[in-house]
Amino acid sequence: YLDHWLGAPAPYPDPLEPRREVCELNPDCDELADHIGFQEAYRRFYGPV
């Protein structure tokens, strides 16, 4: 299977992953993140990362 690795845990957990998921679920934040990066987009919508 080509996607067998998707279920594997990341070797180094990303402490920002929960915030990244919040931003991805907000279409406006997700779109802005594509242009200016996740951390800056999150900050604009939700405050400091």
Curated annotation (Swiss-Prot):
Modified-residue entries (4-carboxyglutamate), positions: E17, E21, E24
MF-aspect GO terms: calcium ion binding; hormone activity; structural constituent of bone
Gene: BGLAP
Keywords, in A-Z order: Biomineralization, Calcium, Disulfide bond, Gamma-carboxyglutamic acid, Hormone, Hydroxylation, Metal-binding, Secreted
Function, as annotated: The carboxylated form is one of the main organic components of the bone matrix, which constitutes 1-2% of the total bone protein. It acts as a negative regulator of bone formation and is required to limit bone formation without impairing bone resorption or mineralization. The carboxylated form binds strongly to apatite and calcium. The uncarboxylated form acts as a hormone secreted by osteoblasts, which regulates different cellular processes, such as energy metabolism, male fertility and brain development. Regulates of energy metabolism by acting as a hormone favoring pancreatic beta-cell proliferation, insulin secretion and sensitivity and energy expenditure.
Location(s), subcellular: Secreted
Family in the record: Belongs to the osteocalcin/matrix Gla protein family.
UniProt main location, coarse: secreted
Disulfide bonds: C23-C29
Record: residues binding Ca(2+) 1: E17
Database matches in InterPro entries: GLA-like_dom_SF, GLA_domain, Osteocalcin, Osteocalcin/MGP
SUPFAM superfamilies to which the protein is assigned, alphabetical: GLA-domain
Organism in which the protein naturally occurs: Equus caballus
GO BP of this protein: biomineral tissue development; bone development; brain development; cellular response to insulin stimulus; cognition; glucose homeostasis; learning or memory; negative regulation of bone development
GO cellular component entries: cytoplasm; extracellular region
Domain of life assignment: Eukaryota
UniProt PTM: Gamma-carboxyglutamate residues are formed by vitamin K dependent carboxylation by GGCX. These residues are essential for the binding of calcium. Decarboxylation promotes the hormone activity.
Record-listed Ca(2+) 2 binding positions: E21, E24
Protein name, UniProt field: Osteocalcin
Residues with PTM Hydroxyproline: P9
Residues annotated as binding Ca(2+) 3: E24, D30
Chain ranges of the Gla domain: 1-47
